[in-house]
Amino acid sequence: MHVRSCLCLLSLFAACEDMGIMADSKPGKKDGAVRLDGRRDAGPGTDVVIGNEAGKDSGPTADTGTPPDACVPPASCGILFSYPKGSESKVELAGDFNGWKGVAMTLAGNTWQTTVTLKSNSQVLYKFVLDGTTWVSDPQNPKKTSDGYGNSILDVACPSTCVKPDSGPAPDSGPTTAFDWRDGVIYFVLVDRFSDGDKSNNSPEAGVENAANWQGGDLKGVLDKIQAGYFTGLGVNVLWLSSPVDAPAGKYIGDDGHYYTGYHGYWPTELDKVEERIGDLALLQQVVSEAHKQNIKVILDYVMNHVHDSSPTYKSNGGWFWSLQYGGKECVCGGGCTWDFSPEKERCWFRSYLPDFNFTVQAARGYSVANAIKWAKDSGADGFRLDAVKHIELSWLTDLRTALNQQVSRPQKFYLVGETYTNDKGLIKQYINPSSMLDGQFDFPLRATLVRTILMRQGTFYDLESFLSANDGYYGSGSIMGTFIGNHDLPRIVNLAEDTPQFGDWDSGKSRAWNNLPWQPSYDRAYQRVGVAFAALLTLPGIPLIYYGDEIGLAGGGDPDNRRFMQWSGTSTHQDALRALVSKLTKIRAAHPALRQGTRKQVWLGNDVYAYELTSGGDKLVVVLNRSDVDQTIKLQGSSYTDLLNGGTVAGSSLTTPARTARILQ
C-alpha cells in the first residue's frame, strides 16, 4: 500500500490537483473550495471541487479497475489567498476567521499573497483591503453574500490523506517529501542521441542518412549516466525524456526531400508499447526509480496530437481522426492548411502519414486521455511535456487534468508543461491554467529575446529589461513556465553565439541541416557568451531547461543536425569550462530561493551591461551580465559583495565585470 498526503495551498492556479481537485464551471457547490485569486485566467472554470463530485460531465477517463482510495480529511490546511497588483501600495486580507483584522499580504511578482490556516469543512467570509481603506470582494470568486456587504464566501474543503491500493507500477524509491517545481532544473534527453548503453538493440534503417536515422542511444544509456552521477554533478533535478512510445519501422520522406526514421519519438505507433530500439517498460521503470533515488524527477514527452498511419489505433478507429481532405485540398500543416489559425491548426496533419486525432469525438478523446494516464501510472513518471499543444482541442487538456487528479498520486503535483511554438504570448497563455489545464508552457518569446540580446548581441539590454518587465507575472501567479535558450527544433546556441552568428533568432536552420553544417567553434568567445546566457536563464523565474549538449556548447544547424550524438569524450577546454560554469550556476540557484522564486528589480542598465536584484525573504542577490567584448564598470548601492560565481569580495562602488562574463553577488 502506498500512502500519500500533503498540505495543500488553494490558489487560482494551483489547487491541490494531486489530491483529486478539478476545475468546474458551476460556481457555488456546497462541497467545493473557491479559487482565491482576483486575476482572470485564460482557461475554463471558476470553482474547484473536491471528492466525489470531481469528474462529473468531464468526459471519459481511464478505468483502472482498482477500488477507490481510502481518504481521511485533516482538521485544517493552509489556504493561499492571492490578489493581482494594481496601483495600491499595500493589500491586507480580512475575514470572519480572524475577527476581520487585516492580515498583511506580500508582493510576489505581480501578485499579493498570504497564507492562512483554516478549519476543514468550514465556511468563511473574506475581503481584500487596499491601502487600509478600500474593501473589495474577490473579483474571481462568484460566491458572495446577498446581505448588501458582498463579502466573498469560501467553503473550505481540505484535501485528504489517501491510502491507495498498490497497482504495481514503478514505485518511488526516493524521498516522498513534496517537491516544488519552481526549484527544478530540467535536462532534456533525446534518448536515441544521448548514450548507447546496449548495442544489441541498435537497428538503423537502410537507405537513411545517419543524421535522420537511429543512432543507438537507449534507456540503458540514460540509466548508466544517472548511476554515474552525471546529472547530479551538473545540478539537474528533473529529466525530460523524449517519447518512449513505439515508433514505426521503415523510412519516410520529409518535407525537405530527405528520408527520416521515427528515432525522435514523435511518430507514435503502438501506443501502449515502449519502442524496442530504446528498451522496454521494465527498463523505463528502472530509469525512473533510479532517478528518484537521486532526487531527480522524470517528465515524459507525450505526443497526443497524432499517430503514424501504421498505428493499429488509426487502422481500427479511422473515425477518431480528421480527414486529410479539407476544403478540396490535402490539409497538411504548412501546405494546404495553416499551422497557426483555427479551425485548420486543430485538424491539419503534420505529414500525410501522420493522421491527426479529432478530439471533438468523445471516444477518441477518452481513449487518448486513458492512454496518457496509463503511461503516467506504468512508468512512475512525475509529469508530461505535451507536444504541439496549439494543435489540439482544449477539452483534451481539461479531461487529462481531471483524470490525473483522480487517478494519479504523487508526493508533488503532476507537472504539465506544453509546447506551443510561437512568439504569440497570448496564444501560449490560452492553454495555461494549473487548476484545469497546463501548469505552464515553454516560453518561446523569452528564449528569442535572450538569444537575440545576449548570444547574438543585437539590440541592447534595454530591450531585455523591457521584455522581462512585461513578462513578469504575465502567465498568472500559479504558472510555472519552462524557460530555455536551446531546444531540439532550433539551431544550436553556440553557433548563434559566434562572432558572426550563423543563424537568426527564429531561424529554423533548415537551409543548413544537411549541407554546409556549422563547425564546432575553436575559440572561447562563443562559449563565454553561452555562459552569460545561462547565467541569465538560471537567475530568472521559471523552471530552466538545458538541452542535452548545450552544457558543452555542442554545435549544430537545423533539424536533424541539431540532434548530433552527445559528445562524451574529446571535449575542448572551452567546452569543459562551459560545463563547469553551468554546474556552478545550477548549484548557486539551488542554494538561493531568490534565484528560483524571488522578485526582480533592475539596479543598473546599459546597452551592454545589465544588473538586477532578486529578493525572496531575507535572501537577496544581485546578478550582473556583461555581453560585450570589453570590461564594463558599474556602481551599486552596497559597499562590498561576495561574488558567488567567481569567488572573492568585490566593491559595489566601482564594480568591473570582465568581457563576456557574469557575476552573482551577495
Name each model feature, range by range.
Residues 483-513, 534-535, 541-574:
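Aromatic/acidic polysaccharide-binding cleft in carbohydrate-active enzymes
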Residues 13-74, 160-173:
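Ser/Thr-rich, Pro/Gly/Ala-heavy low-complexity intrinsically disordered linkers and tails
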Residues 624-628:
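Asparagine-centered strand-capping/turn motif at beta-strand->loop junctions
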Residues 72-125, 129-159:
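Aromatic-rich carbohydrate-binding modules that target alpha-glucans
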Residues 178-184, 194-379, 396-409, 414-418, ...:
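Substrate-binding/active-site clefts of carbohydrate-active enzymes
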Residues 91-96, 630-647:
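Beta-strand-rich binding/interaction modules
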Residues 288, 292, 296, 306, ...:
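Active-site-proximal helices and loops of the catalytic beta/alpha 8
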